[in-house]
């Protein structure tokens, strides 16, 4: 179910969103490390899952994968925990508590006749209200959480093999390997914005991403404009042709096939 224009507008403004009776908040920079831990539970390419799981609502598929792995005596992958952790971040459930305590806030409810089928997850909000989210509801909430926090999801019709090929091509053309440390991005944006790093920690993650992309575009445009004036040419065209708009990427290269999300975490 696609999100509405009003929700998209709220996401761009870094506002909270009401959905399914719940309030979803933009995740803040101060929780970036936890966000990155939970991210594979949201941005996985579901089409890359085995067919039996690919056709299920994502949360139900995660539960079924974990159940089947335990039945075989194998190590579980952890995607269900990642998805629930992302939900906790978005709801600000258990904020400030250790990760294991935040995850313990959720209770999985299953079909009484088929214990491998997840029917809902339950949790207590504000210390008193019992809430229930079904896998179908999570499908919709996932779209909002992604939009609020700068995650680009793969469309259902996407070819997972093509997505993986595009990602690998982007990595090959990406030049030097970067550290990817979150604090480095925060420190750089703080310097460019003439702000304290502690101030930026209170920003929504999407705001940090937007500011970083904007500064990258400004500096890239200035550098390439000077280079073009000196006769420089690029095989695939100027990478920064506009001061105001990003160059359109060929395909979504930010998506995670299941093999990447589960690498080093056992097999499902």
For the regions a language model picked out, list residue spans one by one.
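An amphipathic, hydrophobic-aromatic interaction surface with interspersed Lys/Arg
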Residues: 1-78, 83-85, 132-229
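Intrinsically disordered, low-complexity coil segments
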Residues: 69-77, 97, 109-117, 234-236
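Extracellular-facing segments of soluble proteins and assemblies that are Gly/Ser/Thr-biased and enriched
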Residues: 83-160
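Alpha-helical oligomerization segments
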Residues: 202-268
